[in-house]
Amino acid sequence: LDWCRDNGVKVHGHVLVWHSQTPEAFFHEGYATHKPLCSRETMLARMESYIQQVLTWTNENYPGLIVSWDVVNEAVADGSDQLRESNWTKTVGQDFVNRAFEYARKYAADGVKLYYNDYNTPLDPKLHGICVLLDSLIADGTIDGYGFQAHYSVGSPTIDRVDWAFQQIAKRDLLLRVSELDVGIDDTSEENLQKQAKYYGNLMKIFLRYADRIEAVQVWGTVDDLSWRADEYPLLFDKDAQPKPAFDTLVELAQ
């Protein structure tokens, strides 16, 4: 954050509430895992306190630097239109996402945008579940945008399916972010590199159609060998930091 402040780089915050990155002890009485899970009231108080502390501290120490936040990450279950079972649903219940956004809106500085972020957006029935959740947050007046994680592979999901998902989210008049973009391939043969470039290009054509709504397209890494999917060569630069055909394709489309 110091570097961003000193170099005039605005920041998107990730993430306030995420089931998989919240310590188990946070959900238990006395913060001790051998004790029972907390009551709804206790967990709501802990959630509010945590969100308040993070947002207040960042705003006081880095005023105006963090311009948006992912409030909740990956709450909808794969292969379902329901929230995934987690310690948040076990303690707070099915409205934990709504409560997180309520608290984030309460403590965020004026003008800070609040996002829900998830993956596998193009896949039904998950897309339906995401839309239902977004509609409830829109009704609450607490959400500004949706973050599309886009951890794809060439041909999967199809471009048409990605386009359809964008249509469903965009018609809800939310801001959009492509929050985690990478595209896997089996190997770095010239044929596969060209397929990767074409798929990246087709994705970017979709993104450009919503350019008035998309705040950012964030590639999930820089060079292939440092990617979390290193064995799938998913990024725009190879292990030697040389641009791949996908990079050239995106540059051409951006001009």
Residue ranges and their predicted role:
Residues 10-16, 143, 150-151, 155, ...:
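His-enriched metal-coordination microenvironments in redox/metal-binding proteins
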Residues 1-115, 119-121, 174, 183-185:
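Substrate-binding cleft and catalytic face of glycoside hydrolase catalytic domains
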Residues 47-57, 124-137, 197-206:
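Short, acidic/polar
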